[in-house]
Amino acid sequence: VLSVCRAGDEIIVPRNVHKSVINALILCGATPVYLNTETDSKLGIVLGVTVKQVEQAIIAHPKAVAVLVNNPTYYGICSDIKGICDIAHSYGLKVLADEAHGTHLYFGDNLPINSMKAGADIAAISMHKSGGSLTQSSILLTNNGINADYVQTIINITQTTSASYLLMTSLDISRRNLALRGRQSFAKVTEWAQYAREEINSIGGYYAYGRELINGGSVYDYDVTKLCVYTRDIGLDGIEVYDILRD
């Protein structure tokens, strides 16, 4: 965010952005233009944003310099990030991707499109979530539309000068493992997740949702590796299930 926004700029973001995005806006002085996302009335989860929503926001806010997209959300919901990239670029805006939960999208043939392939200008990827590196370690990917030297300057300003070699080593080991075995590993993960989803749904009373949520708009695609189970039909909410499993 600090690499593309200045004080007085506007940036188009969905309502369910991570708090780190808000913190970055506070630091750089840019103003968020919020996109109101739909919520699934049964599951209670926030869905994605549509290309139409993004274009309407761009037209209404000529001071906007960038669009930020979650790809995917914590619950596996994906917006049409390629369509968003295409429309944003046609108006001269940069596209930033919060791909914290999408490391594996770069290593699966049957998974939603990753942000770099979709045309995003910059993407933050939390390798420690599904890539196997140590907690706190992540990587930042940039396309040709981003000044890499300026990004490095921002990193130097905001991060420690005493970087953890333990974290960096874990990133490199995980990078190598993904490069050599990522596709095979996530093919198995996808298979196991789908098997678990089918078994859970066969029990009755539970609902492990999947690609049936796709509607071409607010749910443009779905990350099947996210195994989420709805339990309200048996009278339990998530906190209660959490306590039962811990006990």
PLM region descriptions:
Residues 9, 90-93, 120:
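A short helix->loop->beta-strand "cap" motif at the edges of active sites that frequently abuts
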Residues 43-104:
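Active-site phosphate-binding strand-loop segment of PLP-dependent enzymes
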Residues 174-197:
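Structural signature of PLP-dependent enzymes
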Residues 5-21:
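Conserved PLP-anchoring active-site segment centered on the Schiff-base-forming lysine
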Residues 13-14, 34-35, 68-69, 95-99, ...:
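General beta-strand structural signal in soluble alpha/beta enzymes
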Residues 191-247:
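Conserved C-terminal alpha-helix-loop-beta "cap" of PLP-dependent enzymes
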Residues 112-153, 159-170:
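Active-site PLP attachment segment
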